[in-house]
């Protein structure tokens, strides 16, 4: 297997695994919204975001499996993948913010914590995309080394989001939000783990 192929596959797997953490949740900003209405919007947007990430990773893996791929090709694929991730994450955060804060105890604070986490992870992803655009393509060994380093840096992408989820979990008194989401049909795919890998049924970890 060509070094580029191995690197791209590993990078795609890493990103997909990190994106799957989003199944934990993400919350909006604005006026208080009925919890069930907010939950339906949240789950719909989250599932769409996760499926987009999964499809992107699948497409990347398929293209990376071409034995004739060159370092330049590999760089272009990585940049395209990360650029799409940056755009989709921004859109995801914007949609959740527009949904308004869930009308529960600490709803506004929960919203702020999660949105901050999404923004932080989005910023890290954007920074990684900048690095990807500067990846050397000659000699091939230089690309492999730089791509490997990028893949390692990618492991920290979810840290801001995870911190936001942890903070939200502590704010979700009595797991109010989590309990509501488990009753919504729009959230079934997140609850049963059929979207993403390692997903969880609780939005706030409470």
Language-model segments: which ranges?
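Disorder-to-helix initiation segments
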Residues: 30-46, 60, 67, 71
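Amphipathic, charged alpha-helical scaffolds that flank and support histidine-based chemistry
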Residues: 130-140
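Alpha-helical segments in soluble extracytoplasmic regions
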Residues: 49-132, 146-167
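C-terminal region of N-terminal signal peptides and the immediate post-cleavage residues
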Residues: 12, 22-41, 200-204
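Short, intrinsically disordered, charge-biased short linear motifs at domain edges
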Residues: 25-32, 169-177
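Short, low-complexity, Pro/Ser/Thr/Gly-rich segments in the mature regions of secreted, periplasmic
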Residues: 182-206
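Bacterial N-terminal signal peptides that target proteins for export
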Residues: 2-15
């Amino acid at each position: 297997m060509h070094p580029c192929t191995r690197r791209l596959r590993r990078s795609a797997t890493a990103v997909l695994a990190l994106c799957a953490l989003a199944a934990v949740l993400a919350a909006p900003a604005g006026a208080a919204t009925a919890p069930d209405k907010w939950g339906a919007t949240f789950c719909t947007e989250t599932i769409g975001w996760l499926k987009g990430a999964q499809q992107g990773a699948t497409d990347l893996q398929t293209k990376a499996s071409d034995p004739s791929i060159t370092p330049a090709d590999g760089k272009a694929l990585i940049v395209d993948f990360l650029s799409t991730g940056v755009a989709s994450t921004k859109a995801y955060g914007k949609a959740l913010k527009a949904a308004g804060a869930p009308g529960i105890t600490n709803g506004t604070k929960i919203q702020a914590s999660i949105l901050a986490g999404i923004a932080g992870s989005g910023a890290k992803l954007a920074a990684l995309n900048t690095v990807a655009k500067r990846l050397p393509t000659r000699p091939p060994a230089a690309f492999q080394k730089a791509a490997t380093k990028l893949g390692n840096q990618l492991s920290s992408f979810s840290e801001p989001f995870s911190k936001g989820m942890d903070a939200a979990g502590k704010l979700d008194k009595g797991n109010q939000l989590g309990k509501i989401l488990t009753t919504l049909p729009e959230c079934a795919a997140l609850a049963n783990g059929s979207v993403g890998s390692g997903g969880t049924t609780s939005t706030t970890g409470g």
